């Protein structure tokens, strides 16, 4: 069974430490069938090991307006990578401490979006 684990990391629960630990131990995780991806997209003031940030992050254009086309492009690119990596791994781990909050406010449909993505495999 293929599983996408999403660590939603509530504040002050050592989420950053978990993310650094997963990155530092990627090879060990990999040998045990767990893939912890680091994506090319970087976000200002966001540590690069918050690999689930693309699930909830806004993208902005040069005028400071939300760029939904760019958001969809990055989401699609990263989800396609995840779907591909399921051909090599049974378990994929994403982590971001903003997911717990975002799913209650501006990204309420995230779980439904991910459920639909799971049907594409």
Annotated model-derived regions:
Residues 72-80, 105-115:
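Well-ordered, non-membrane alpha-helical segments in soluble/globular domains
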Residues 119-121:
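Conserved phosphate-donor/acceptor-positioning beta-strand/loop module used by diverse small-molecule
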Residues 1-100:
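PAPS-dependent sulfotransferase catalytic core
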């Amino acid at each position: 069974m293929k599983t996408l684990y999403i660590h939603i990391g509530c504040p002050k629960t050592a989420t950053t430490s978990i993310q650094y630990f997963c990155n530092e131990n990627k090879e060990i995780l990999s040998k045990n069938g767990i893939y912890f991806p680091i994506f090319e997209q970087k976000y200002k003031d966001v540590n690069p090991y918050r690999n689930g940030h693309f699930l909830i992050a806004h993208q902005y254009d040069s005028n400071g307006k939300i760029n939904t086309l760019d958001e969809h492009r990055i989401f699609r690119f990263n989800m396609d990578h995840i779907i591909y990596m399921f051909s090599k791994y049974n378990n994929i781990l994403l982590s971001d401490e903003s997911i717990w909050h975002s799913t209650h406010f501006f990204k309420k449909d995230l779980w439904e979006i991910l459920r639909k993505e799971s049907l594409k495999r």
